[in-house]
Structures are given as structure tokens and as C-alpha cells.
A protein has these predicted regions:
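Generic detector of short, locally flexible boundary/turn motifs and exposed helical patches
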Residues: 18-25, 58-60, 85-90
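Enzymes and membrane/adaptor proteins characterized by extended Gly/Ser/Thr/Asp/Glu-rich
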Residues: 61-76, 81-179
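Mature N-terminal segment immediately following signal peptide/propeptide cleavage
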Residues: 31-65, 85
Length: 179
């Protein structure tokens, strides 16, 4: 089941491992033309199935529905690992129900990434106030911020910049790469 193509359009996957992909982004200051060339080359080496899979960001229950459509997955199950690998999904979104403590969250993200043929976007909704999947959990030991309404009322761009940097740094340490 799933996406399938046949005939001359089908080719074997030649996507690089996570380690190889990380090396490609280590270089900073890449100009737009060089980035375009590298991205085009990478895309040329992807199968159609991998390209389609990259369009999807899913929750953990969509990777493993064996416990129902709303389960508090906190570990990477064998089925999740297989699904990430098989469909080359673009990313996962995690919710409060998936986030317990720092070590558990890092481990879950690492195992998902280790099974992904293309590095995943790992997302979490972390705005401040009531929208704080990480900071709202005292076991995560991250910085809490007020709601966006309160932040906006301050009209302090330096505060907003520092807030964004702090949230970004806090979630990056856990393995998230999209807020």
C-alpha cells in the first residue's frame, strides 16, 4: 500500500544519511546560487515517493495508530521507526501529550531522526502564555513567557527578539527545529 510507481520512472533511493546531510549544512555563509545547486542535486537523487513523503508533517499517532488516534506516545515505537523510514515523511509535530521530561523528549526525537532517510522537521507549538508545550511543563526546565497579546502590548522589539531567540535556543537543545 502507499505511494508506488513502476516502470522506467522508478529508481532506487540514493538519499544521504542524516550524518551526511548534517555535514552539508555545517558550512555557513553559502550563497543562494550554491544552495540552489546543492538542493537541486539532492532533489534529483530522491525518488518520487521520497519527494511526496517530504510534503507531510504528521503527529505520532499517524506514525503508529495501534493505540488509537489519540495516544500519549512518549517513545519511538518499532512501527513509528518503520513508518518514518518507509514513507520518508517530512516531519513530525509533537504535542504536550508526547513531552514528558527532557531526556525522554531528546531520546524520542533522536530515534525518529535516526530512522528518517531525510532529516525531519520536528515541530512544536511554543509561543508563550497558554501556547507553551515545553515551557508549560515544569519538568522541561525552560523559560516561560507571557502570551503574545501581552508581549505585543509592550511594544518592545528588543524583548520580542530576545524572547524568540530564547524559545528557539530552548527547543533546539531538545532536538526541535521548527516552532
Amino acid at each position: 500500500t502507499g505511494c508506488s510507481i513502476s516502470g522506467k520512472d522508478k529508481k532506487e533511493s540514493t538519499t544521504k544519511s542524516l550524518a551526511a546531510s548534517e555535514k552539508a549544512v555545517e558550512k555557513e555563509g553559502m550563497d543562494k546560487e550554491e544552495a540552489y545547486v546543492k538542493a537541486s542535486e539532492y532533489m534529483r537523487n530522491m525518488t518520487l515517493e521520497e519527494k511526496v513523503g517530504q510534503l507531510f508533517v504528521v503527529n505520532l499517532e499517524q506514525l503508529d495508530s495501534s493505540k488509537g488516534s489519540y495516544f500519549e506516545w512518549k517513545k519511538c515505537s518499532k512501527k513509528m521507526a518503520e513508518t518514518v523510514k518507509k514513507y520518508s515523511i517530512g516531519g513530525v509535530i509533537m504535542f504536550s501529550r508526547n513531552i514528558g521530561v527532557r531526556k525522554q523528549t531528546k531520546s524520542l526525537i533522536k530515534k525518529l531522526q535516526n530512522n528518517a532517510p531525510v532529516p525531519l522537521f520536528v515541530t512544536v507549538d511554543e509561543e508563550g502564555g497558554d501556547v507553551a508545550r515545553i515551557a508549560g511543563n515544569p519538568d522541561m526546565k525552560t523559560t516561560s513567557f507571557p502570551s503574545m497579546e501581552e508581549v505585543g502590548s509592550k511594544q518592545n522589539t528588543e524583548y520580542v527578539k530576545n524572547m524568540g531567540e530564547t524559545i528557539g535556543n530552548d527547543i533546539k537543545k531538545l532536538g526541535f527545529n521548527v516552532d
